[in-house]
């Protein structure tokens, strides 16, 4: 009897997944959208789910499959997605018709079970996101950001001291940059003096290093909860363990309590977020809760640690491979330092440094896609000449391509060549709008980038 029940359940489950898999095909076929058939359950992300490749290459395979299409179909586990390949459509989705695509893709974690992630600005939706964004924006003005510059310089000196003490030894550059990034965020974000070069096993660095290190088990878990989102929320599934949540909660709350009690102010992210709501009439928030503030500070850390560390590490990698670029950048920085010490204001005078960073973010962009979820019925133009328009309904998901466009020879000739001069004043007019979007685009652009 038990065996028969098991066989029945397995047969039903297999039948359900096969039917769902065929529905994905039907979704694209009905809309006249070309797609690459994936595998049942996993869609087009089978390889990346099991760690065989990075998710970028799953996207790239589909992106390259139909080079003349403005958008193509992509399958994540039981979810049809449109990959937007056309810069003009990306412009419409992220700016012109933003009111149809105000939100990021829905997630599988409730604010009750995973307040660190679910309660962040990045995942807020609709009016709640709009109000939080308006409230937070003053914290990212140029006048506020420049006060964090001394913290970065101080931590840079720690790097120089470490390098001077280990001149005769091999240096793990990736580890070096991660420790530097960790210390800058700890100081400018949390008001903590953490020297990860002397205290290599400090808890702040350990948690930051492991926060997004998903093993195969965690990836499969993510696939499963994406199949059963209601169960994930019901049973309190969360992306981060209790240890991570409790660590950040304790840091933020204890720091806030100390500063309020002792009337201490420090120009870091916690202070800016504490001050942001002052004098503002909040419509959807009666007041900022501790959980909401903790969530914003956490995302400042999580969103900055990996992306900044990767960008700096890849810049160093490219400078090592391109000594001519390295020498040109070195001379620019040296000439500037001979005139004056580095400040927030004269940092903007380093034009070639800006070109170098832009080229790194083109070739090695941490942001692979800009996801958007349709909130109002919307008509996309035909994917090709002679095709039919595609009607999107509320809940439909689009991925505006970032990395794939930036490595497309159609928009960037010889994309594998590291050439910062693409972004020089003389050449940057050749870059087609909406093909270089490392910080996003439109009202949901990175809040730090939006202030500059």
Where are these regions (language model features)?
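Cytochrome P450
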Residues: 1-14, 74-82, 143-154, 164-187, ...
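N-terminal membrane-proximal hinge/A-helix region immediately C-terminal to the signal-anchor transmembrane segment
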Residues: 2-114, 127-131, 151-161, 244, ...
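Conserved cytochrome P450 K-helix/beta-meander segment immediately N-terminal to the heme-binding cysteine loop
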Residues: 400-428
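Conserved cytochrome P450 catalytic core segment spanning the I/J/K helices
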Residues: 46-50, 60, 141-143, 168, ...
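Hydrophobic mid-domain F-helix/FG-region of cytochrome P450s
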Residues: 78-91, 118, 157-160, 171-198, ...
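Cytochrome P450 heme-thiolate "Cys pocket" and heme-binding signature region
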Residues: 118-119, 387-389, 394, 426-452
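Conserved cytochrome P450 K-helix E-x-x-R motif and the immediately C-terminal K′/meander segment
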Residues: 46-68, 250, 254, 340-387, ...
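Cytochrome P450 catalytic-core helices
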Residues: 307-332, 450-452
